[in-house]
């Protein structure tokens, strides 16, 4: 049921007829993309400043990803986890090298960030301890284990009781973290920047303090880099800005350049916790997704996109702050993961007026607009957004 009669209106009707209502009905239906531009079924174009929520680090239809996926699919599409393939091994080798730990590091592949965090949850149980510590307002996924770690009652309460012995503490509060971690704590789960809660950046030294606290108590430090990894903040892993090495890192989103793949990297003793039969994933390490991820890693390196994310992010942040718009309180984040904090809860309105103006953004909180564009976005496209932002915000609050 596609063709000339397909419009946003008809697509919305078809969606409502067959899709579960967990997302509501999307306001537009997209048909194609190229670079940082997407086109809807009505032929209207938008600058994509959300990148599939930090997924499309190379934008849409990147030739390197297309070539890698096409070549691999024409050779070997899927094998299950019963057999080894070159793309999976090569991808694990590259991720281990990028993490750069001075101890043995091992990788488990899965399909998403939630699955990567579930794997980390299970690793923590294998320490022989059961207590976990995470942050209020954190987001680690919606499967039951990752949901238990997610510090958002609105998402948790409908599904209670949740697994685990999880204590939530204030994000960025070193004293609260130290008080919560004891000799029974298996792991502390933290995001280097809390993306889903409004691009919340912790105080300087927080991650280093968390590393010290967990090391002293013999607990694992698990860093959820699902949104902050893949060069988005100006370092391949956001925690590398702090010069620390966690015990476990989870990764997904941008790793596959649009294809579903997640990874759980474990360092040192944590790398030896899983033994045959304790965990698995039918699709994890799928050679097509792994080939796509290898292509993403190589383009990030060859095109200098990690450093570029840092430079463009600073320019974008300064440009927005320089507007001096009364609805803008401040801009926070790092690299090309930014949150425009507003003086009033108009982020959802601004998401809609930005879309009307041809820009896709996201209301990560009632008063925060999240930006997570492709790392290949042109500077001129970002400049265009900055120029359009005052009118977008004015319309969001009903100003003439």
UniProtKB/Swiss-Prot annotation:
It catalyses: N(2)-acetyl-L-ornithine + 2-oxoglutarate = N-acetyl-L-glutamate 5-semialdehyde + L-glutamate. It is found in: Cytoplasm. SUPFAM superfamilies: PLP-dependent transferases. Homodimer. It comes from Mycobacterium tuberculosis (strain ATCC 25618 / H37Rv). Keywords: Acetylation, Amino-acid biosynthesis, Aminotransferase, Arginine biosynthesis, Cytoplasm, Isopeptide bond, Pyridoxal phosphate, Transferase, Ubl conjugation. Pathway: Amino-acid biosynthesis; L-arginine biosynthesis; N(2)-acetyl-L-ornithine from L-glutamate: step 4/4. HAMAP family: ArgD_aminotrans_3. May also have succinyldiaminopimelate aminotransferase activity, thus carrying out the corresponding step in lysine biosynthesis. There is a cross-link at residue 314 (Isoglutamyl lysine isopeptide (Lys-Gln) (interchain with Q-Cter in protein Pup)). InterPro entries: AcOrn/SuccOrn_fam (IPR004636), Aminotrans_3 (IPR005814), Aminotrans_3_PPA_site (IPR049704), Class-III_PLP-dep_AT (IPR050103), PyrdxlP-dep_Trfase (IPR015424), PyrdxlP-dep_Trfase_major (IPR015421), PyrdxlP-dep_Trfase_small (IPR015422). It is an enzyme of class 2 (transferase). Its main location: cytoplasm. Belongs to the class-III pyridoxal-phosphate-dependent aminotransferase family. ArgD subfamily. GO terms for cellular component: cytoplasm. Its EC number is 2.6.1.11. The modification N-acetylthreonine is found at residue 2. This is Acetylornithine aminotransferase. PROSITE patterns: AA_TRANSFER_CLASS_3. GO terms for biological process: L-arginine biosynthetic process.
């Amino acid at each position: 049921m596609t063709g000339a009669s397909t419009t946003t209106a008809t697509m919305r009707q078809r969606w409502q007829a067959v899709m579960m209502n967990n997302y509501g009905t999307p306001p537009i239906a997209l048909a194609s993309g190229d670079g940082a531009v997407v086109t809807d079924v009505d032929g209207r174009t938008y600058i994509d400043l959300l990148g599939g929520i930090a997924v499309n680090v190379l934008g849409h239809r990147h030739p390197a990803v297309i070539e890698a996926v096409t070549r691999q699919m024409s050779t070997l599409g899927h094998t299950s986890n019963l057999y080894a393939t070159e793309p999976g091994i090569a991808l694990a080798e590259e991720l281990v090298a990028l993490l750069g730990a001075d101890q043995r590091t091992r990788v488990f592949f899965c399909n998403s960030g939630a699955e990567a965090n579930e794997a980390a949850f299970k690793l923590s149980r294998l320490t022989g301890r059961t207590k976990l510590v995470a942050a209020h307002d954190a987001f680690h996924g919606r499967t039951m284990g990752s949901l238990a770690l997610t510090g958002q009652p609105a998402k948790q309460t409908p599904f209670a009781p949740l697994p685990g012995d999880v204590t939530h503490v204030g994000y960025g509060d070193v004293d609260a973290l130290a008080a919560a971690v004891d000799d029974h704590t298996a792991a502390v789960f933290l995001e280097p920047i809390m993306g889903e809660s409004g691009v919340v950046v912790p105080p300087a030294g927080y991650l280093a303090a968390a590393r010290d606290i967990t090391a002293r108590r013999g607990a694992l430090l698990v860093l959820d880099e699902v949104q902050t990894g893949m060069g988005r903040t100006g370092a391949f892993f956001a925690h590398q800005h702090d010069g620390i090495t966690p015990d476990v890192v989870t990764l997904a989103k941008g790793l596959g350049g649009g294809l579903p793949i997640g990874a759980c990297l474990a360092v040192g003793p944590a790398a030896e916790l899983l033994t045959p039969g304790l965990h698995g994933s039918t699709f994890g390490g799928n050679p097509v997704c792994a080939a796509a991820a290898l292509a993403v890693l190589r383009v990030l390196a060859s095109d200098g996109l990690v450093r570029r994310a840092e430079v463009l992010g600073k320019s974008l942040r300064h440009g927005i702050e320089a507007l001096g718009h009364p609805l803008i309180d401040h801009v926070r984040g790092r690299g090309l993961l930014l949150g425009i904090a507003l003086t009033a809860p108009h982020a959802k309105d601004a998401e809609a007026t930005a879309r009307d103006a041809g820009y896709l953004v996201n209301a990560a909180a009632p008063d925060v607009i999240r930006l997570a564009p492709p790392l290949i976005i042109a500077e001129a496209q970002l400049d265009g957004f900055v120029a359009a932002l005052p009118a977008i915000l004015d319309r969001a609050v009903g100003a003439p």
